[in-house]
A protein has these predicted regions:
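Short, solvent-exposed loop/turn segments at secondary-structure junctions
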Residues: 89-91, 129-131, 163, 189-191, ...
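C-terminal catalytic-base region of ester-bond hydrolases, centering on the histidine
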Residues: 244-345
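Alpha-helical membrane-targeting segments
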Residues: 6, 195-227, 259-276, 301-307, ...
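N-terminal mitochondrial targeting presequence
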Residues: 1-55
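A Trp-anchored, charged/polar loop motif used as the substrate-binding/catalytic surface
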Residues: 65-67, 222-241, 330, 334-344
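Short amphipathic alpha-helices and their capping/turn segments at secondary-structure boundaries
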Residues: 61-78
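Active-site catalytic motif of lipid deacylating hydrolases and related acyltransferases
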Residues: 76-154
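Serine-dependent carboxylesterase/thioesterase catalytic core
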Residues: 87, 135-241, 280
Length: 345
């Protein structure tokens, strides 16, 4: 059983402190309980309360995936179209810190595994402005695809904010030399983030003015942060960014239990759980759902999704508690490729 399910199913052990500025005003906070990451694998979850079904914390988690991607299978089908990997906020394709330091890859081990599929399919790792606006990032995404796909149709797999970039490119920019057959989003905040609200409203421990100054001194933009709020995504972005009937849309979400005390995602997880329910530390399950929702990855964090798992943590868990990893990011993305192949994409 996963740690997420074993410890109260993605719930805090003690009642959370109220966040009056963030709790939805449609119903009293005391009358609602966030939908937790619980239940039996592959079962659809019925909300605990139905007083206000529009409350995001009460949405269905869909299929819960606990160990389907624990190991890499012997065979995966290969999609017929190239795959584009679109990174999230503050992401990169490859980061070099010096001539004597090995480069850091955002898609650690994932892009290489996809390229090793039968037929050696083309895999394009896009590189967009790390903290630029959705519009800026989408334009660069389109340019990267046009330059590297060279007229071939593509399937986009996007992590986090990368999914918003891809949606904007498909709906607004519509590059003549880019033909997108499918978009698979992984933990993309399609309905914004309560944690972004928290930061923008000046309630967080991080002072945005200081953060913006640091980012600008590094030569990067800061427009992305304000575009991840729930107000902007729900009020501006989604109404003006309709899906294309020529593109297949798929999505995955993830949830994890309360992060360790010193984890940088502990506060963001708490805020998201109180306001939106089950989440991966940065994006809620409710916000991740778009198009054909394929399921919720249980006991998987936002960084686990791109193979940035803490190997030391899992080694300790295995030695002291006998726990083994139930999620392998490489197996997950190979399965997405297999799914696309079976869909004829």
């Amino acid at each position: 059983m996963s740690a997420c399910l074993a410890r109260g199913l993605c719930r805090r052990r003690h009642p959370p402190r109220a966040l009056p500025a963030l709790v939805p005003t449609r119903a009293p906070a005391a009358s609602l309980r966030p939908l937790a990451c619980r239940g039996t694998r592959n079962l659809s979850i019925t909300p605990v309360l139905t007083k206000d079904d529009s409350d995001p914390r009460l949405r269905d988690l869909g299929k819960q995936i606990s160990d389907e991607f624990a190991v890499v299978r012997e065979h995966y089908d290969t999609p017929k179209n190239p795959i584009v990997l679109a990174h999230g906020l503050m992401g990169f394709a490859e980061l070099r810190l010096g001539s004597y330091v090995p480069p850091i890859h955002y898609w650690h081990g994932i892009s290489d595994a996809l390229r090793a599929l039968a037929g050696n399919p083309a895999v394009i790792t896009a590189a967009v402005p790390p903290s630029g606006s959705i519009e800026e990032r989408a334009a660069k995404l389109g340019a990267d695809i046009a330059a590297k796909a060279r007229g071939r149709s593509v399937n986009i797999i996007a992590h986090s904010m990368g999914g918003l970039d891809a949606r904007y490119m498909i709906s607004h920019l519509k590059p003549a030399d880019v033909d997108v057959k499918s978009l698979v989003t992984v933990a993309t905040p399609h309905r914004g983030s309560a944690f972004a609200d928290f930061l923008i409203n000046g309630q967080g421990p991080i002072k945005l003015a200081n953060l913006y100054g640091l980012i600008e001194r590094a030569g990067l933009g800061t427009k992305a942060f304000g575009q991840l709020t729930r107000e902007y995504i729900e009020g501006e972005f989604n109404p003006k960014t309709p899906d294309s009937d020529k593109v297949r849309y798929f999505s995955y979400g993830a949830c994890t239990s309360t992060p360790p005390l010193l984890s940088p995602f502990r506060q963001s997880h708490r805020i998201l759980e109180e306001v939106e329910g089950a989440n991966d530390g940065l994006v809620s399950v409710a916000s991740s759902q778009w198009g054909d929702y394929k399921g919720t990855l249980v006991d998987v964090s936002h960084l686990d999704l791109i193979n940035w798992s803490n190997r030391v943590r899992w080694t300790v868990r295995k030695v002291l508690m006998g726990q083994t990893r139930t999620f392998n990011a490489v197996a997950f993305y190979l399965d997405i490729a297999d799914m696309l192949a079976k869909e004829g994409l």
